[in-house]
A protein has these predicted regions:
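Catalytic-core "active-site belt" of small-molecule-metabolizing enzymes
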Residues: 1-179, 190-227
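Loop/turn positions that initiate beta-strands
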Residues: 180-184
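Glycine-rich anion-binding loop/nest that anchors nucleotide
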Residues: 185-189
Length: 227
């Protein structure tokens, strides 16, 4: 799947052939258990081990500002987004938007059913590698049409397992053939007030060292759930 991004003000194209969603990637055992508990509260079974790497169709990645979902039981979550292409690594921003009702039945299936919104801007990973864990992640939600934004998630990449471990564990650098790209969503932070649906989702990845920010927001259009 061909997708264009913005790198240092210039457009760069990737042919995405392989997409992975890493789950249960919290570095702190208590943080992992917190995420397990908040998902258990909505019926999701605990993982068999941590972390886990879920394959999804590459066509699920989208830069649109609106996604369509079935029913009212979906929600987004901010995640670092990695692109590996021809031996070069890039960092971006994504939301692992997930059907929580389906997740209670199968996490793997729930990862496949919703599009994964990603920001258009990316950075070269080697530009941030020496301060990667200082990079800040925040998301906000608007639960109903017309509502103000409410802070939903907040933390740094240091809350997630080292990205180098996730890269190695997933085989990211070697998973796509020459000339193609592999991408990975790298895990999330706990939600303030618990996991819940919203009408709009906004997220930001801020580099306090180089003074720059990647942002993206999208609306969620709920399609009727017909039985």
């Amino acid at each position: 799947m061909q997708m264009n991004f913005t790198l240092s003000g210039k457009e760069i194209a990737f042919d995405i052939a392989h997409c992975t969603v890493a789950g249960w990637t919290g570095r702190d055992a208590h943080a992992i258990q917190h995420h397990i508990d908040e998902l258990a509260a909505i019926g999701v079974k605990p993982p068999s081990s941590v972390p886990l790497y879920y394959r999804t169709a590459s066509g699920m990645v989208t830069q649109q500002d609106r996604i369509e979902v079935v029913g009212k039981g979906t929600s987004g979550e901010i995640e670092p987004f990695l692109i590996a292409s021809d031996g070069v690594l890039y960092l971006g921003l994504a939301s692992d938007h997930t059907d929580r009702e389906l997740e209670a039945h199968s996490v793997a299936l729930s990862k496949q059913i919703c599009e994964k919104p990603v920001a258009k801007e990316i950075w070269r990973f080697d530009e941030v590698a020496d301060h990667i864990e200082q990079i800040e992640m925040r998301s906000w939600i608007s639960e109903q049409d017309g509502d103000d934004w409410v802070l939903y998630q907040e933390g740094t990449i240091a809350s997630i397992r080292p990205l180098s471990d996730l890269i190695d564990g997933s085989g990211l650098m070697s998973s796509a053939p020459a000339g193609k790209a592999s991408v990975m969503l790298c895990g999330t932070l706990g939600a303030k007030g618990g996991v819940r649906p919203a009408k709009r989702f906004k997220m930001a990845l801020h580099d306090p060292v180089l003074g720059r920010t990647i942002e993206h927001s999208y609306a969620i259009n709920e399609l009727p759930e017909i039985a």
